[in-house]
């Protein structure tokens, strides 16, 4: 259904039917997991506040960052007319940012704590996505590289923080089940992110035509980045519900 929504000619009734079927199946699966004695996926860890927050809001964040490597090459090649080598070289800056910040992530968690770090860095993630929406064919290469590098830094910090906090307060006996549930949700979020990116491009096409902005290079992709930034912002709402000392058993170690 999500894939159909992102096509040029979405089939209304088929899409609605698939969404309805998926919703009913999902609710039935939840009911089954809660009732059966030995479910394939146990939901016991959902009673842990930190795990629940990272699963709900964290999934929206993972979906939004998963859309970035899909949107950027398309914007550079289809929207701006770059060749594949040029576009791919620019996108590498995101992954350089991912790698170079890794050694500093743990000290940042211990310094700020999980809640403060996820809120501050989450806001920076939103700004980085909005900055991608401001990129034009005339933007200097060094500015594009800086924006993408910083975006990679922020997404890496957020991803590591969420993944660490998820298991910080989960009791030992539930750890295996929690890991299965978290891994499943992560993979679903990655697929959802790509679908949301395609839908965002489609919405960007419609909005750009409605506002008579179709002559602006890459406008549909740039508007898609705005939509993804909003999704990332919504994912931060759950973080506000965290206790001030959430995950302190992990973040306070070796201080």
Q: What label would you give each PLM region?
A:
Residues 1-4, 21-36, 235-243:
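C-terminal membrane-cytosol helix-exit motif in multi-pass small-molecule transporters
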Residues 1-15:
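Phenylalanine-glycine-rich, low-complexity intrinsically disordered regions
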Residues 11-13, 18, 38-207, 216-246:
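12-transmembrane solute porter fold
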Residues 252-255:
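Short, intrinsically disordered terminal tails adjacent to the first/last structured region
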């Amino acid at each position: 259904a999500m894939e159909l929504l992102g096509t040029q000619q979405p089939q209304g009734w088929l899409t609605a039917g698939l969404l309805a079927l998926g919703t009913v199946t999902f609710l039935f699966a939840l009911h089954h997991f809660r009732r059966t004695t030995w479910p394939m996926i146990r939901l016991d860890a959902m009673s842990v506040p930190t795990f629940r927050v990272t699963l709900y809001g964290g999934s929206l964040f993972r979906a939004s960052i998963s859309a970035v490597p899909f949107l950027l090459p398309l914007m550079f090649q289809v929207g701006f007319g770059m060749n594949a080598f040029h576009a791919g070289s620019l996108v590498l800056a995101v992954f350089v940012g991912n790698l170079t910040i890794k050694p500093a992530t743990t000290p940042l968690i211990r310094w700020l704590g999980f809640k403060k770090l996820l809120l501050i860095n989450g806001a920076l993630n939103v700004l980085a996505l909005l900055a991608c929406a401001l990129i034009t064919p005339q933007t200097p290469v060094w500015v594009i590289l800086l924006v993408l590098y910083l975006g990679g830094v922020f997404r890496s910090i957020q991803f590591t923080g969420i993944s660490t906090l998820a298991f910080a307060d989960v009791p030992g006996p539930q750890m295996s089940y929690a890991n299965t549930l978290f891994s499943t949700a992560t993979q679903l979020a990655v697929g959802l992110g790509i679908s949301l990116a395609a839908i965002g491009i489609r919405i960007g096409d419609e909005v750009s035509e409605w506002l008579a902005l179709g002559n602006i290079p890459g406008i549909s992709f740039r508007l898609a980045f705005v939509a993804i930034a909003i999704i990332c912002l919504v994912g931060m709402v759950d973080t506000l519900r965290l206790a001030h000392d959430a995950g302190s058993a992990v973040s306070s170690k070796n201080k």
